[in-house]
């Protein structure tokens, strides 16, 4: 009987939750001696408002391929040809909705990795010159989401 009451109470609770589905930008340096990068911008298509857009540094020429759907995301491949490394430069994400944060991952050819988070309040992020050894941004984003309720 206690088991039955437990399940009735458990499933009668009205939970106010939504899917945690952040946007994700993954930038990979293709050559350790050249500043050529390939980026994949993954933005959830079930989102409120405009699709978020990436603003890369002025030091980079960009070329984008056509958008395509994969799973829950609209994907965009972006090719960057930069005059110098992305280290020390800024990336901006515009048009993020209140419910969508963006995880940014930059993988350099020398095995350095940077991870950071942007949102609609803090839309610009600086890629540090020194590497980020612990890629914890996604973990902290999830914890913040759980603890703050959005």
Q: What residue ranges belong to the model's regions?
A:
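Sec-dependent N-terminal signal peptides
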Residues: 2-13
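Histidine-/acidic- and/or cysteine-rich, low-complexity loops and terminal segments associated
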Residues: 15-147
């Amino acid at each position: 009987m206690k088991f039955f009451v437990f399940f009735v109470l458990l499933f009668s609770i009205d939970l106010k939750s939504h899917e945690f589905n952040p946007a994700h930008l993954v930038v990979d340096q293709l050559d350790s001696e050249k500043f050529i990068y390939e980026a994949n911008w993954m933005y959830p298509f079930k989102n409120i408002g405009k699709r978020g857009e990436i603003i890369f540094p002025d030091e980079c020429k960009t070329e984008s391929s056509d958008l395509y759907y994969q799973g829950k995301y609209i994907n965009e491949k972006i090719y960057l040809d930069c005059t110098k490394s992305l280290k020390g430069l800024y990336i901006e994400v515009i048009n993020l909705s209140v419910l969508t944060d963006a995880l940014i991952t930059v993988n350099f050819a020398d095995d350095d990795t940077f991870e950071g988070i942007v949102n609609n309040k803090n839309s610009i992020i600086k890629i540090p010159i020194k590497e980020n050894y612990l890629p914890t941004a996604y973990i902290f984003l999830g914890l913040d989401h759980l603890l703050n309720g959005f």
